Amino acid sequence: MSEPGEEPVAAPAGPAPDPVLNELYGSERPAVELLPGVPLSPIVNSCWLPADAKAMLAESWIPVPPEDAGEEAGPPPPAFEAAAPEYNELVRRLAKTAPFRKWNELTIQAKQLEQEVAGLKGPDAEAKQAELENVKVQIADAEAAVAEVKQSFSDDPLSLTGWMQALTDLADGGMTTFEVSGQGWPYCSLRQLFGEMPSAAPPAGFFDGVERVLGTFKRRYEKERGPGSVQLMLKLAPNVFSDAWSTGGAPAAVAAVEAYVERARANVFGPDGGVTPEGVPEPLDLVQLVWWDFAAADPLPVLKALQRMATDQLQVDEDSGEVSVSEPKKIRGIGLVDFPADRLKAAIQAGVPITCVQVEHSVLVRSAQPVLDLCAKYGIKVLARGGTLGGLLSAKYLGAPPPDPVRGDADLDSVPGCLDAVNNVGGWARLQAALAVIKGIADKHGVKPETVALRWQIDAGCFPLVTTRWSSRVWRQFGYEGWSSFEVSGGRPGVDGPLFQVESFLDVEDVRALAGLAAVHLGPKAG
């Protein structure tokens, strides 16, 4: 406190707001890091593929006219017709690229310098003119970089496909963190989970496809926006039931982890990528361990193998005493999926550095609270699934009958999975009552019901995992229909800004009403 007559001492400035969230939503929320140098967006996109990965990666936005049977010619060049939606999207995308932003910044700087030069004479004018010439050289370099990025749209048939644009829209909306996901047991076959042959390593087909799709997106997006613009959370799900696992012990665990990491790096970085200009392997952002049965096998050997791969291996020169990296780390961080509190504590006590834990935790399901308490104690981030109950906590389903599992519903993660979740929280009538409360709170604050459910997770200290919708439905998971059209959205993200503010819009009355909706308080499942 300052003495009388003294100038008041200014309070120390807090962390600066995240520039993207501030620009899009007027948010003062500071940027958050998953790990040092690895951002974590407020909402994490959980990606289930809408189609086979091979088919998605074979798509092309480039129109190909019918072939003339009388002539043999190579593929026609892309035609950027001004009326084509792809052309409009290309222009918008190009304007957001790092090279274009740099060119724009330098152009403004050059104009300012030209004005300053006009008012100077002698040595001052010469110095300022030299500065201007240097900026002009940088502008020429930036123009070349812009031209290269523009050409890359023509060279990359995936660059303007619907699925690529959907992921781009989400990242442009400030949600730059993506997680591999998909329907698990019992909604997929055991063969899909564990492959044809008993093996300790997970089959290439389970998360392999979504890894390749997200890896392709990451490489494309970072070509436009710069390195580190997208973060990927991967999953390792070993087959703990196989004979190879039970008899192999720790060596089998190490071999399985190493094989998985190498395959995942190829999926994410491409066959020729994943190496820095200095020749150092680029590490994966995060690997989350999925453990099917804690009674069948102990996850600790796998966690220790992951820990080793998340640590630079060092060597000391006997003569000079200098320390150098003999084996760079292959992953940056380790996460856990659905580990109960006792297993999480065992991993922590074993010295495994856990970055984050993924659980189901929502306004209706609070069974993971012991895990949240432990994470708060040790500074571990929590990723929360189930915020919108697979998409059911939406105005669309208020007063509606249950969805038909035969007909399906594109606005839900999985109709069978959602119906099972409804049964777990007390049935359709119980869901309708809860949805009416949530809708009332949403109307009170001028937001979508999905926003209320997700904000509750954020206020609980979690980072919500929201399942991605695709193409024209890209913003449907946040309650916005038809928002992929620029004419409808005006280029604004289809998500309510109050989700990203520091202060919650939920008041005391809202919190009390939502507290009464909890339907599941049982202990977390081990698996």
Curated annotation (Swiss-Prot):
GO terms for cellular component: cytoplasm; cytoskeleton; motile cilium. It is found in: Cytoplasm, Cytoskeleton, Flagellum axoneme. It holds the Pfam family Aldo_ket_red. The modification Asymmetric dimethylarginine is found at R191, R366. Residues 101-153 form a coiled coil. Flagellar radial spokes contribute to the regulation of dynein arm activity and thus the pattern of flagellar bending. They consist of a thin stalk, which is attached to the a subfiber of the outer doublet microtubule, and a bulbous head, which is attached to the stalk and appears to interact with the projections from the central pair of microtubules. This is Flagellar radial spoke protein 5. The gene is RSP5.
